[in-house]
Amino acid sequence: MAKKQTPMMEQYLDIKSRYSEELLFFRLGDFYELFNDDALIASRELNITLTGRPTGDEERTPMCGVPFHAAESYIETLVKKGYKVAICEQLEDPKAVKGIVKRDVIKVITPGTVMTENGNDARSNNFLSLFYMVKDAWILVFSDVSTGEVIWHRITDCEKRSDMFDALSMYRPSEIILPEGTILPQDIKDFIDNQFSNIVLSPFSTYHTQREVAEKAVTHFGNLGLMEEDVWEALGYMLLYLEDIIKSEISHINYVHQLSVGNRLILDTSSLRHLEITHNLRDGGQKGTLLDVLDRTLTPMGARLLKQWLESPLTDVNQIQRRQAAVAELITRGAERSHIRSLLDCIYDFERIVGRVETGSVSPRDLTALRESLAVLPDIKNVLSTCASLSLTSINDRIQDHKDIYDLLRRAIADQPALTLKEGRVIKDGFNPDLDELRSLATNSEQWLAKMEADIKEATGLSKIKTGYNKVFGYYFEVSHSKSEQVPDYFIRKQTLANAERYITPELKEFEIKILSAKDKIIALEHELYQQLRNDIKLVIKDVQETARALAELDVLGSLALVGYEEHYICPTIVMNGQINIRDGRHPVIEKFLKREVFVPNDIVLNHDDEEFLLITGPNMAGKSTYMRQAAILMIMAQIGSFIPAREASISPVDRIFTRVGASDDISTGQSTFMVEMKAVAYILENATHNSLIILDEIGRGTSTFDGLSIAQAVVEHICKHIHGKTLFATHYHELICLEESYSKLKNYTVAVKEKGKDVAFLRRIIKGGADRSYGIHVARVAGLPNSVLKRAEVILESLEDQSHDASDLNNRVMGGQSTNVVKPAVKQVSDSPLGNLFTHSVLDSLLEVDVMSMTPIEALNKLYELQEEARKGGGK
């Protein structure tokens, strides 16, 4: 039978029962201790020593701990790994309590509610997401608790997952919360598991009615205009969860807006990923992305906003032109741009600092950073007052100088305060008379103590006597054993050491009481003054947040201006005629990182008159994919208001950009490369509009040649007949170039090639016309395939080309000179024509059965050799 638990362990188990999903950091003196399974997890994840503690059980309870003053870094590590941490503090002074100190959880830290400076990536948002399902809709809410921003999105078609997946890809939440009763469909779970690592799904219960939940949101946010009741309910559930987790005021969460669809360019999951807008494909980092090129921001707020702009560009012409005008003004006024940027460089992340003011976790160094940030606001406003563009004048109007708060912080906070309030010396001398008096007493005490020591030495002749202090019995005099016989009678022995004796005196004890009392009073008064200062700042948090958002916009515009100036970008003309006309456009990312080459510029012309669909054929490695990605990236740049790398450009905004480039298996869902490709194409054909930009690269390559060709042609025809979106379609199926004869708005383009013998140079220029070969052997030679393989491939290629010519001649005779490589709208399928008899030959039957895409290169060459030998035996060459 187990022994009864100790009182402390009973208290721990009671609290732990209410926080079973969290790792409980249980405060014991100067440490946070973890027990049982929590200790096993923490010791493994933090690489700290696992010990045991007698708690009443027959066996020692597993335990580990971290110093409370260093706990923040340990907690951040656990949270980044996907754990939730509950902080259980001592709510009473152990010195003033007999028995067990009262303890309770003061806050819970989760991946989506981190507020500390080091716990969040300063240049990225950290979103918590709520999924709320009602009868006919999903409501998604995304909240960055550290900045106070809330975005909501109502999806009325519950079966259409694309809107949900696109929103999740844009905001990339670190935690998803689910009100009680919400059950995620399996395909949504699969998407979340596949796209996000260490994400936490947090179900939570509430005893409030739906009406009470909605009313809570209305009370908190005020008038947000007309919204569905279920949106208010979703916002209310978010607030209830945050209050339960943070356990403090959250009025700083006040910047609410809807995820705009009508006036935003929608970039779906695939486009964001394959265009490498904010994360690269290599390791998910920023290096080599469009964000990497454009991000010259100087403030964390600006960095976060630029990322949002890139992931959600504008479609409204007036808004785009307003941004362009601001960028243009900052480019032409170099002195003002440099001055503004030098001032922005002095600004800290006070958007998040005021969030910590609200929740009570603001540090003295945070307030110093806020003070230094506010100090430069008048100078920024002075520079902006000379600007003429609407965006810059609007920013100036939104920035307040917050003089009252700045003056308060300047007078109240020490120039170099301690890291924590407990260390003292946070409040500046001269701010509070009572505090000054107590500090004077504490400071002068050292002088008084030195004088007392000197007087004792003179009166007793004990020249080696010295004063000291420890926590056990306070101040003391220390005398060596050899001199202990000379101490006066009023000395009271308190401790015997190996080589000395320690004494106190009535006068020394009286001094100690006065000094320690002063120190305790200093700590208490500094804490009181600090809290009052925090309360004063809380009164203007909303205004300070608006200033931070205005500065973020200024920082982004300044960043775009600097990049545009340094890289010699031009301002594209924004038009509404449906045309994209870019002359000598360049890929901004590749151009930046090219070391030894000059990037070859290309024109991009798309319109609804005669060049709506560009069918691009040509060699691999020649630049087709770069050209298409370049078109999409330049559109994104133009639609955020940026200048672009080109000689000149006029651009009509597009509503969506779709990309299907690259191919890979989706192992997590058991889907092959071809299935993934077909699903992506189906999504594009279902969602693309007349105003969309469609990028399709090598559709149909994941299946047999005839299947792939048929699918590719059918996709081309569907877009040309039904969607009429501006399209760039790269393909290795050269047979498709004949479609130019059937569709007036389809034009063939290819990559210019210069041949000299067996040497081939890809000129990287996109020109009108179609390609009749892929130069695959040349690419293989560049890739380093053995010469023996290359020579064998050339022999096989020559043989296949001869057979192809024979078939083409027969085809011309049968069809009266018309090519049936591609089925034109008025021509029967090959299988329905006399030409179909060609494919009854056993060799051709065998060829049709070959799955080339599943073979290695060597296996493919061997198979070709076998078929060639079989053909020779049947009477071939």
Language-model-detected regions and their locations in the chain:
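Amphipathic heptad-repeat alpha-helical coiled-coil/stalk segments that mediate oligomerization
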Residues: T206-A217, L265-I266, L281, E372-Q447, ...
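ATPase nucleotide-binding head domains, primarily ABC-like/P-loop NTPase cores
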Residues: N36-A39, E228, W232, L298-T299, ...
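Active-site phosphate-binding and catalytic loops of NTP-dependent enzymes
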Residues: C88, P111-N120, E249, A388-S391, ...
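Conserved phosphate-binding elements of NTP-dependent enzyme cores
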Residues: A2, E10-D14, E21, R534, ...
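C-terminal tails and terminal domains of large nucleic-acid-associated
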Residues: L838-K877
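Charged, surface-exposed helical/loop "interaction arms" that form contiguous linear patches used
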Residues: T359, S363, S373-V376, D429-G430, ...
